Amino acid sequence: MTHPGFVLLDKPAGDTSFKALFPLKRLFGTRRIGHAGTLDLRASGLIIAAVERATRLLPFIEVADKTYRFKLHLGFETDTLEWDGKLVFQGEAKEITEESLKQILPDFLGEQEQIPPNYSAIKINGVRASDLTHRGRNVTLSSRKIRIDSLVCLGKSSTQLEETGKSFAIFDMECRCSKGTYIRALCRDLGHALGTYGCVSEIRRTAIGNISVENEIGRAH
């Protein structure tokens, strides 16, 4: 008989959160395994998995704040709000410095309304918004209340110049936020606040509440 409990997993980018549980199901010989806090396919980092009766406690874990590290790309925006999506808007970013970015970060702290990305798992009449967007349907998502407790610029990664003469800048960021916060949408909104456009790469969840990914004891394969 499998004993109830929790397992900390480090999900690699490219795997779904559901797929990350497969090794545990084989290891423990049970299908009664769930997880708290779905990560985007392209994101990596901490997932807390619950086994057997421990799954009853997942709702209490899901409401915990989350901490992420990511790269903020300024100067363009894509359909997915990920750096390698289809380009939809392009602006300038060569004048944006680490100091000018830091000046606007306090404006993003606290409770606020955020419009989720169209490429998301939010359902409209039972269908994921991302599926509707793929089909070419016009998707309009309502804003949702979120909370950002901490938003820090860790430094500027680089500035690159396109052949068109347009420039874009990349900053390393860290954010601690409430359940339901989309980092992709945050990067979009940061870009708009700076008079340009924004998207994201390398999202990594480093903590759920006080539990850090550095404490993880398993890696999903």
PLM features per residue range, with description:
Residues M1-R219:
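Catalytic/RNA-binding core of pseudouridine synthases
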